[in-house]
């Protein structure tokens, strides 16, 4: 769950930087948040599939 929290933190940084006019920081933070979110999503889907197939009792 920590990875998702980091993604949300970088999203908030991106929004605040965008509001304040720091477009370079905003774009970089948005890219980091997007990458972390997709990593979290892939890990979640892999564990979901493993939980439904291999680790079934």
From Swiss-Prot:
The keyword Nucleotidyltransferase does not apply. GO terms for cellular component: plasma membrane. Its main location: membrane. It comes from the Bacteria. It is found in: Cell membrane. The chain crosses the membrane at residues 6-26, 35-55. The keyword Translocase does not apply. Keywords: Cell membrane, Membrane, Transmembrane, Transmembrane helix. It is a multi-pass membrane protein. Belongs to the UPF0391 family. This is UPF0391 membrane protein BRADO2787.
